[in-house]
């Protein structure tokens, strides 16, 4: 950790957390700044190369790492700053995220596989690109995510939004309808029905 954070100078970007450069690994390596999932992924790679028993954890509030020496309790690391995180702190984070009745459970601290880590990274990168209105790159993130979860209605809904911004209304309508059919009870479904009607009307006006 001293090598990574002090000698090499990696750190979490507190000033521009949602900057997409904090998710692109090449930019993280160049700038020495990132977010938990990008810094954590680099630490995982380095740790595995050096033989450390590191694992990724998709904690609700942010990506974490666990160091699991045989016969010892796991040590939880915050890759944003390299600090050890106690279970008391994790409980506090969970309460802040989910409410006062939230309880820290073993499943919150389970190790995850590489596809899950990639999925979390893609979601954060896509979110950053959407904030920056870089829709073509955001679409590539969604397409890549759908190779892992081809039928995920929420990912398909997001793809529909991106296609709408790219003025590809017919494809957007198709994606929105897929979400409405598969998640009829989601609050977003009613809003998307209105959006589909508006897009359909716009398409008809354009055709005429």
Give each language-model segment a name:
Residues 1-208:
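A structural boundary/capping signal
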């Amino acid at each position: 950790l001293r090598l990574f954070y002090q000698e090499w100078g990696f750190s979490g970007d507190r000033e521009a957390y949602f900057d997409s450069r904090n998710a692109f690994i090449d930019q993280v390596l160049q700038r020495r700044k990132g977010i938990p999932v990008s810094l954590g992924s680099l630490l995982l790679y380095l740790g595995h190369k050096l033989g450390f028993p590191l694992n990724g954890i998709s904690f609700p509030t942010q990506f974490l790492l666990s160091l699991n020496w045989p016969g010892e309790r796991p040590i939880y690391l915050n890759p944003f700053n390299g600090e050890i995180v106690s279970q008391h702190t994790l409980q506090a984070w969970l309460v802040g995220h989910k409410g006062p009745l939230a309880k820290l459970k073993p499943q919150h601290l389970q190790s995850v596989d590489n596809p899950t880590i990639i999925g979390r990274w893609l979601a954060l990168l896509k979110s950053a690109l959407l904030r920056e209105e870089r829709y073509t790159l955001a679409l590539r993130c969604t397409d890549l995510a759908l190779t892992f979860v081809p039928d995920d209605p929420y990912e398909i809904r997001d793809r529909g939004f991106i296609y709408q911004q790219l003025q590809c209304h017919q494809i957007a309508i198709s994606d929105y309808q897929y979400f409405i059919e598969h998640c009829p009870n989601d609050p977003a479904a009613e809003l998307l029905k209105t959006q589909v009607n508006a897009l359909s009307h716009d398409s008809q006006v354009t055709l005429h």
